[in-house]
A protein has these predicted regions:
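Active-site and adjacent substrate-binding regions of carbohydrate-active enzymes
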Residues: 1-313
């Protein structure tokens, strides 16, 4: 299930305001418990979506955190002072465009949001934050869910020093992805996550792992890794280039797609399985995404389906 938690729905539920509740649009906690139980009767399991890089700005944690610099949740999010001229702490561009920083007058500081302004990043360096997130995940395991998809997990570890990066577009900014994805030290957090939540449970886990190279896969999946599987991005990023907007397209060659798929297939084959996909809630239909406008859509769809259904995974 994509997120079914209470949410203002700024980002289709990926802005969560309560990690242990159910959005009234979808039902009640009792309905969820019934769904889990009825699925088990049919030898199926419910996999939930965990969004742990950030919360909604309407989450009680953030509402308290932004209220002052000395409250109990003050350090639960990533706050920084402005530059001497009052501008944002760094020139980082958010994944959805615009600055990755938003000013909060209550604190007189900026908060970091990798994605939308309404999705402030949680401070994983704070052990209280990690413990609260682990409790929420275990809450659902106690309810009987069969596992988790963990959203945007490669962004949870931030660099020790926040500084400007080399601009990658005419706006003078650099993608926050370049500056924060898969930062060294992230595996310490993830192995703790595994110990505190995954271990001891017969569950399935899949991480949305943008920025993990094929050579790093053994650290992320398999017996000595963290997750059962990983969503990789190399192949779906072949037609994409970073820029000022969410998705700038560029011409691409089949050889690049083949190389990206071959590398991930070889890397994962040594350790486990890789979920194969060409489209999801973040991407346009694959026929539109991968094919030029003058391509035959029927032949293109058949070609993409042939590749998709003959890969290992």
């Amino acid at each position: 299930l994509t997120p079914v938690y209470p949410s203002p729905m700024v980002d289709n539920g990926y802005d969560i305001s309560d990690y242990t509740g159910i959005n009234p649009q979808f039902g009640t906690l009792a309905d969820m418990e019934e769904l889990i139980a009825e699925a088990k009767k049919r030898d199926m399991r419910i996999v939930m979506d965990l969004v742990y890089n950030h919360s909604s700005d309407q989450h009680p944690w953030f509402i308290e955190s932004k209220s002052s610099r000395n409250n109990a949740k003050s350090g639960w999010y990533i706050w920084r002072d402005a530059k001497p001229d009052g501008s944002a702490p760094t020139n980082w561009r958010g994944i959805f465009g615009g600055s990755a920083w938003t000013y909060c007058p209550e604190r007189g500081q900026y908060y970091l949001h990798t994605f939308a302004e309404a999705q402030p990043d949680l401070n994983w360096e704070n052990p209280e934050v990690r413990a609260a997130l682990y409790r929420a995940a275990n809450f659902w395991l106690d309810k009987g869910v069969g596992g988790f998809r963990i959203d945007a997990i490669t962004y949870i570890k931030k660099p020790a020093v926040f500084e400007d990066g080399t601009p990658d577009a005419a706006d003078g900014m650099v993608s926050v992805h370049t500056m924060t994805v898969n930062t060294p030290g992230i595996l310490d957090f993830l192995h703790e996550f595994r110990r505190e939540v995954f271990d001891g449970h017969d569950i399935f886990t899949v991480g949305e792992a943008n920025g993990v190279s094929p050579a790093e896969l053994p650290d992320w999946v398999g017996e000595n890794g963290v997750f059962s599987m990983l969503f990789e991005f190399a192949h779906v990023l072949v037609p994409y280039e970073s820029g000022e907007t969410w998705c700038n397209m560029r011409p691409w060659k089949l050889t690049k797609l083949k190389a990206a798929l071959s590398a991930s297939q070889a890397g994962v084959a040594r350790e486990g399985w890789c979920p194969i996909y060409f489209e999801n809630h973040d991407r346009a239909r694959s026929v539109n995404y991968f094919l030029p406008e003058d391509a035959d859509p029927v032949l293109g769809a058949k070609a993409l389906a042939t590749v998709l259904l003959t890969l290992r995974g």
